[in-house]
Amino acid sequence: MSPFTDPSRTDSGTDPALDGPDESLRRSLGVGRRRFLSTCTAVAAGAVAAPVFGASPALAQDRGRDHGHGHGHDHDHGHGRGQVLVPADRRGIILYTVRDATARDPLASDLPSGFREVFKQLARHGYRQVEFAGYNQHANAPGGASLESVQGARLLRSWLDDYGLRAQGNHGFIPSSWPLTAEDKETFKKHLEIANILGMDHMGTGSDPTGSSYRADWDVAADKWNELGRIAHREGIKLYTHNHDGAYGFLLDGGPLDDQGRPTRSSGIRKLEYFLKVTDPRVVWLEMDIFWAHVAQYKFHTYTAHDGSTRKKVFDPAGLVVRNNKRYPLFHAKDGVVSTTNGQGYDMVPFGTGVIDYRTFFSRVGDRNYHNPMIEDDNSPSATDPAQSLREAKISYDNLAALRKRC
């Protein structure tokens, strides 16, 4: 597998092989591929250190910024110290965080339920962007149980537009087959069509490219993602993968072989670092889950080198983004408190109530008008407190909005 030599390149290029069938019309109009289809549809329808034990308390909530449907006045036009780190139009949430609300029966509860009511509530909180985690909701909600269709996407788009929200991505269908079966390829294209109707710039998955630790398997994953990325690129969509902690562990790429002929030692490169090197930067993108990246920082700080020596290498999530900034258009922004018992270093909590230093992370990463942080908290839904997830979504929004640049 030959590495791509320009991992920072972000231009789409003019390679005819990457062009779609509507290029002549699109170019005559002077608009991008994604915006072309999206507009037609609308008209028709952390830090460097290991876990920060004893870190600063939670950010104070700033609740004076919400007006109407979240169109707050953040006065974030300043420069340097004190600058808002995440502009209002970049503040998003993955709907997995409030999955209990979208799945709630509107006939059995007065709380917001189904996509339409949840969109309304999130807009009131101040959010401007959402990332989908599939298109299913309760069957009694407007539109029915599944909106995973062209018609369903048009309905979702109308609700997003009603509440001033923008769809920025989806954790959805990535074919399991490789080489791609005809059926998987058609299903993938259907999801790209849905993404375009919804106005998304990005489409991806909540899973790692592979769960393997071996270079050969990551080479196969890179081939697959390069092909899927080219298909998505032709439809004007940036295809992205999402990480958990294991993907930032060390790649096994040398040393003695085990009894199955597989390498047992590492050169010190992390799996997703290698993936960045061997995927095409024009067509494959990443969403860093900052919580899981910090778990990886806690768990994977030594490796056995090819010569058998033990070497230390602390993971720097922000540093990796800085070196590959345009490859990371999306983040999952979720927080954690220190745990000494769960083996991960952190327990998830609402954003801004934990110890992960997001002020430093976003200050180092910069490019605030490019990155799209999506609030996520796996633990927000509660079996005993049905209002909790949307309530915590508000807490998380306020803390994200309160972040100011560190010099």
Question: What are these language model-derived features?
Answer:
Residues 53-96, 100:
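C-terminal segment of N-terminal export signals and the immediately downstream linker at the start
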Residues 105-122, 181-193, 313-320, 358:
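Short, acidic/polar
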Residues 82-87, 119-124, 145-168, 187-199, ...:
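Acidic (Asp/Glu)-rich catalytic clusters
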Residues 113-135, 198-199:
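Catalytic domains of carbohydrate-active enzymes, especially glycoside hydrolases
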Residues 41-42, 51, 175-285, 295:
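Active-site acidic/histidine proton-transfer and metal-coordination neighborhood
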Residues 19, 23-30, 35-57:
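N-terminal export signals
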Residues 1-31:
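N-terminal secretory signal peptides
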